[in-house]
Structures are given as C-alpha cells and as structure tokens.
Amino acid sequence: EKKDEYLSKSSASAAPVIDTLAHGYGKVLGKGRLPEVPVIVKARFVSKLAEEKSESLVVLSN
C-alpha cells in the first residue's frame, strides 16, 4: 500500500533508490516484481534473470 502511494505521488524524473546493502542483502535475484518507473538499486550482485526482467534498472555496486 505504501509503495503504491509513493509511486502515485512521485514524479517521472525522480527514481527511487533501493539500498539492499543497508538492509543486509547484497544480491538481487529478480524473483519479485518491479514498478514501471526507473529504479536505482545498490547491490553487490545482480543475477541474469534480474537484468533481463528489468529494462529500467540502474545498479550501483560497491
């Protein structure tokens, strides 16, 4: 609910940042669903499935 509310209020030029490292995760496997807006993800590893599944995903790795 909060995610849908956030996405409806956000502008098209601002992309949300998901910091997986701050929450103790370093991998993005692509098993969930992503919104249609561009997303910036901070992660150490991104699987091929996640890359194929998301065209508008920007990954920042350490």
Curated annotation (Swiss-Prot):
Q: Which InterPro entries match?
A: Ribosomal_uL15/eL18 (IPR021131), Ribosomal_uL15/eL18_sf (IPR036227)
Per the record, GO CC terms? cytosolic large ribosomal subunit; nucleus
Read off the Pfam families from this record.
Answer: Ribosomal_L27A
Q: Listed GO molecular functions?
A: RNA binding; structural constituent of ribosome
Tell whether Ribosomal protein is among the UniProt keywords: yes
Q: Does the keyword Nucleus apply?
A: no
Arranged from A to Z, the UniProt key words for this protein are: Ribonucleoprotein, Ribosomal protein
> What is stated as this protein's family in its record?
Belongs to the universal ribosomal protein uL15 family.
Q: What is this protein called?
A: Large ribosomal subunit protein uL15
- Please tell me the species this chain comes from: Candida albicans
